[in-house]
Amino acid sequence: MAIWLGRLTGSVQADFAHGVRRFHSLFGESPIKSGCGCSGTGITAKASAAIHRVLNARYGLRFEEHHVLACEHAEHKQGFLKKQHPDLQMLVSTLAELAAAEAKNLLNPQNCPKELIPFLLMFRLGFPCTSRTSLSSQSSENVHCVQKEEGATGIGFKEGFKYVTVHWPFLVMLECVKGLMQKTPDYQLSDMEHIVKQFEARKYWCLPVLLDNVDYGGDSWRERLWWVAVLNLIHGKVTKQEVDQFFFRMLHAFKSPGPLIDTKRYVIIDDEDLPVSIA
């Protein structure tokens, strides 16, 4: 990220600096509580902490993020989360548990009662892509699975979105395969557009964008669909078009001229192979 920040020029640099300082004025005085659905090994929380260190060095602004809520069904990944994320206050097994005010906390002994689910400023709404990935032989049969609330992808989004409707995090980020951009003649909206409408109905600004891995420093093509949703706390002051334009300018500014990492020096492994004790 330090390399990307160094490439910002002109008004984009000023806009970014202003945005970071504005965010810090609102939330920088106390720890930013974050959480994730479908956490895996929680690598996004580790990456987020690295970004905060860069912003501190660049702008002198101290952000402190506490990764307090995780959701993961696989037991070996639960063990990794417990070991590598000491800030965790609650670990649950399924997305459906996040729709309530209380849930069983896997960090505590089995005989403990349910605990209050912590409020989050930032929520990474992970949901499975298995119904719409091109690797699935049934992908073409699952177009609009999000709107139909079917399959792992449709049900996963439904359950994860319930957390938003119950707990109202300020910032929500989502990622899935680009198959959600497809639609058939009998539907007015693609699943991508449907997700945007779901957030807008609850007074969030929501921007969908298709990003390619090679544009941001990767050495191989890997397109993914992302959404950023921000709770609208200043109704009428800023238009959705202005917010969208700002995000698109940021995304364009951060595009890399080539790979930033020499992957020949590293071994890429699946996160399921990571040992619990990894540093």
Q: What residues fall within each predicted segment?
A:
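Conserved active-site and SAM-binding loop architecture
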Residues: 1-279
